[in-house]
């Protein structure tokens, strides 16, 4: 059983418990403009992530204050803040998500492994404006159902792919925001070539986000020149002495610079 399979098995157990406990219904958080619109333009957008740990890197910043970190991200110009909420493998929590959404005005992504509608309800109840759907973790029927349910619930969706076959599945879904994960979730190996290759076949009107393994402004520049509208950065910002410097430098990257 690979890492992704183990995570999904854990999620099935979590979903079973959620269905017993229930989730309170809530109104979707209101934004001034859609996240899809926010990710447009010539500037390279930053989705800045709060990430305590990961299966591949172990503990990264267990004692981080998520509110203070989120405020640093927002003040530095992050377009979206991502909060990892998986507890077993990434040591995050829904409490982190709720605290961040109350502290900042920018949209917040609930970064988790969604396999059931009740997880979307939970993310919404804790203030998320955006959820993640990982194509590799879902069959087509479930993917389509969760995608439609999220939008019907007033949330937007980042649909994550890793290869050409997954990209085709996401395109059939007519996903508006596509994340290209440079990390293979089955082996947790990373290569920026994944984004460079998949960005060759962009569809008009879709926002493309390169995720994972981005460590330098030069890499951000390369990805933007290849067609990325934004980048999702977690570990690099969590380990940085001053994440604001990195975010501000990336915010200065424009298409017309190249």
Swiss-Prot record:
The protein's Enzyme Commission number: 4.1.1.48
Keyword Transmembrane helix set for record: no
Keyword Lyase carried by entry: yes
Biological-process GO terms, alphabetical: L-tryptophan biosynthetic process
Catalyzed reactions per annotation: 1-(2-carboxyphenylamino)-1-deoxy-D-ribulose 5-phosphate + H(+) = (1S,2R)-1-C-(indol-3-yl)glycerol 3-phosphate + CO2 + H2O
Coiled-coil region(s): none
Listed pathway(s): Amino-acid biosynthesis; L-tryptophan biosynthesis; L-tryptophan from chorismate: step 4/5
Signal peptide, first to last residue: none
Xref: PROSITE patterns: IGPS (PS00614)
Principal EC category: lyase
Keywords for the protein's UniProt record, in alphabetical order: Amino-acid biosynthesis, Aromatic amino acid biosynthesis, Decarboxylase, Lyase, Tryptophan biosynthesis
Gene Ontology molecular function: any one: indole-3-glycerol-phosphate synthase activity
Cross-referenced Gene3D superfamilies: Aldolase class I
Domain of life: Bacteria
CDD domains: IGPS
SUPFAM superfamilies membership: Ribulose-phoshate binding barrel (SSF51366)
Annotated protein name in UniProt: Indole-3-glycerol phosphate synthase
Species whose genome carries this gene: Exiguobacterium sibiricum (strain DSM 17290 / CCUG 55495 / CIP 109462 / JCM 13490 / 255-15)
């Amino acid at each position: 059983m690979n890492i992704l399979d183990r995570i999904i098995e854990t999620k099935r157990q979590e979903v079973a418990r959620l269905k017993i406990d229930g989730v309170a219904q809530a109104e979707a958080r209101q934004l001034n403009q859609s996240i899809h619109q926010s990710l447009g333009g010539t500037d390279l957008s930053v989705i800045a992530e709060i990430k305590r740990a990961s299966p591949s890197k172990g503990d990264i910043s267990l004692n981080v204050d998520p509110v203070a970190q989120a405020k640093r991200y927002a003040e530095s110009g992050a377009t979206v803040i991502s909060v990892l909420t998986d507890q077993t493998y990434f040591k995050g929590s829904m409490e982190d998500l709720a605290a961040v959404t109350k502290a900042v005005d920018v949209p917040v992504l609930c970064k988790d492994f969604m396999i059931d509608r009740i997880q979307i309800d939970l993310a919404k109840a804790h203030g998320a404006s955006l959820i993640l759907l990982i194509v590799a973790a879902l069959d087509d029927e479930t993917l389509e159902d969760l995608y439609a349910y999220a939008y019907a619930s007033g949330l937007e969706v980042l649909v994550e792919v890793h290869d050409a076959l997954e990209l085709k599945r996401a395109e059939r879904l007519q996903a508006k925001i596509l994340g290209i994960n440079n990390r293979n979730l089955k082996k947790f190996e990373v290569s920026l070539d994944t984004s460079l290759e998949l960005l060759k076949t962009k569809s008009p009107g879709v926002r493309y986000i390169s995720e994972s393994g981005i460590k330098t402004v030069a890499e951000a520049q390369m990805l933007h020149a290849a067609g990325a509208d934004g980048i999702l950065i977690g570990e690099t910002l969590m380990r940085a002495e001053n994440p604001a410097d990195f975010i501000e430098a990336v915010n200065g990257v424009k298409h017309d610079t190249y």
